[in-house]
Swiss-Prot record:
Gene Ontology terms, MF aspect: DNA binding
DNA-binding annotation, residue ranges on this chain: 201-220
Protein's name according to its UniProt entry: Sugar fermentation stimulation protein A
Source organism: Escherichia coli O7:K1 (strain IAI39 / ExPEC)
This protein's record includes keyword Transcription regulation: no
Gene3D superfamilies found in the cross-reference section: 2.40.50.580, 3.40.1350.60
Amino acid sequence: MEFSPPLQRATLIQRYKRFLADVITPDGRELTLHCPNTGAMTGCATPGDTVWYSTSDNTKRKYPHTWELTQSQSGAFICVNTLWANRLTKEAILNESISELSGYSSLKSEVKYGAEHSRIDFMLQADSRPDCYIEVKSVTLAENEQGYFPDAVTERGQKHLRELMSVAAEGQRAVIFFAVLHSAITRFSPARHIDEKYAQLLSEAQQRGVEILAYKAELSAEGMALKKSLPVTL
């Protein structure tokens, strides 16, 4: 996926009110960007980081600029727009870049399912194969090349794991897919030090037949794509 039109560069002053960030452009203008990420954004929003942003042609938007990527002061690229995790995963599935998810003839998005009234990110179908339910999570928290999810306690994420276990128990295929959107990450684990319950549920889910996949995106200011499978340690 290529960014079109090209992203523009600025330097981060501060992120605040969760949804806003002030930046300064190379020519000295101060802008307020929309921040499409409600998470903690640990390590992704340090003042002085380079920010890459898009600009909407919708004249009715109060904040027409959207923060898409961070380029940290160590040089790592991080996709902070959480919407891209699903978009990149869908693109990779359709391009058959994810070998574990290839060979299906139909892809549906946001399908209602489960006893807890959830919506699955993607459902894959094919003749003579069980349906494949895929829940996507964006991974941007990094420490010494180790990627972690979540970056804050997530009751919603815990619910999704319970739903996937129910799907697997019914004989369908259930997949939790971690889209790693940080160029410095080389391996993945659940963030037990942040959400122990989620880590416990992820281990239980694997034991009950839920598949765990982690794929890393190649990231740059020009574009990004999920390319490489990463090792997962529970």
